[in-house]
Amino acid sequence: MQNTEDGSQALKHLQHPRFARAYARAVGRMNRRGATEHRRRALAGLHGKVIEIGAGDGSAFVLYPLTVTHVLALEPDDYLRSLAVKRAATAAVPVTVRAAAAERIPADDGSADAVVASLVLCSVADQAAVLAEIRRVLRPGGILAYYEHVRSERPVLGAVEDLLTPAWQRLAGGCHPNRDTLGAITDAGFTIQDNQRFGFAVQSLTPSVAHILGHAIR
């Protein structure tokens, strides 16, 4: 497996050391509660060259099907990327880890068969810009595989998420709990192939939060 850590001064504003360490500790619990199977469903059927944005600690690397020939995994946070590099070494498919943000994907136009966004579109500063960049690197007919938490359709819970968002994004690495990510994907020109909406509690004592999982075609 090829791994690179070419850090950049341009990524300094995307460093969240405390949140990154807290997130890395929480991922194991999330995975045991069902996040692993959610990611597995999102990755099923992918093939060829794949770009994963916001790869985090690399938990998804072992889940890629063998039909994938290469994964370019992008993670701007130094700490999470260091964990991803270690996981890339034991992945079932070739994985290259790069220091890069989703706003500027280091890939040519139309070079990817699929792009994976897993619990990352909640935290990017500009969803529309990131989705436009994803469209740029996808070939015509390429797939965006997504697994994201989104704003609740329940009026009271949705209002609470709206209220919490300004403080939460400062504490949680830019995360917005109130985004309409499915709407943003369709507004960006993608065609939804399949979509599942479900509640998922990341820990036993936390409330169930709305999630979406599916695939969209460029």
Protein language model annotation of sequence segments:
Residues 113-126:
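A short SAM/SAH-binding and catalytic strip from SAM-dependent methyltransferases
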Residues 51-104:
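Class I SAM-dependent methyltransferase SAM/SAH-binding core
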Residues 196-218:
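Core SAM-dependent methyltransferase catalytic element
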Residues 26-49, 59-63:
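Conserved alpha-helix/loop element of class I SAM-dependent methyltransferases that forms part
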Residues 143-167, 172, 208:
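Conserved class I S-adenosyl-L-methionine
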Residues 173-189:
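Short alpha-helix
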